[in-house]
Amino acid sequence: MLRRQVFAFCLVSLFAFNSCQKEDTSSKSPEPNPSGSVVTNVDQATLLQLVNDTRQSGCICGSTVMPPVAPVTWNDQLASAALVHSNDMNSKNYFSHTGSNGSSAGDRITAAGYTWKAYGENIAKGHPTEKAVIDGWLTSEGHCKNIMSPFMKEMGAARVGSYWTQELGSR
């Protein structure tokens, strides 16, 4: 009899636990993580491919013809800096290159452990996919020039909620 009661209690507890969990219904992209360890809520391989396809073919940024440049590689330190900034913008509901604590992109990149010679940052809000955010950045002259800069050798990016951050850099 006691065994039945314990079994019934376990069964009811299991059902109650599962029914109290809220399923995440937000639209998140898959997270292939080619280099490793930073969970960025973006499809890193897709972002890297879209950026490098553009860099390798060249493009027009505003009225400036940008010739083909070498591809960039993924960097987890840059991705970590991007994640910090996207999280900050999302949690404090603002949109700016300046962090809520007054930090610049260079400050955040340095804090993530990346020793840079040059860096650039792109931010966006509201784009539903990796392709949409890259397309948006490429239609903005300044963002496009960041992506196409021959001085940029590595990148990392992250999305939190509807806030995207891309960090580009070279050491």
PLM feature segments, named:
Residues M1-N18:
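Sec-dependent bacterial lipoprotein signal peptides
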Residues C20, C59-C61, C144:
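Disulfide-bonded cysteines in secreted/extracellular proteins and peptides
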Residues R4-V6, Q56, C144:
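Hydrophobic alpha-helical segments, especially transmembrane helices
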Residues P32-S91:
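A short alpha-helix/helix-coil micro-patch that ends at or immediately precedes a cysteine
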Residues D76-T129, I147:
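Short, surface-exposed glycine/acidic/tryptophan-bearing loops
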Residues S13-V42:
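Bacterial Sec-dependent N-terminal signal peptides
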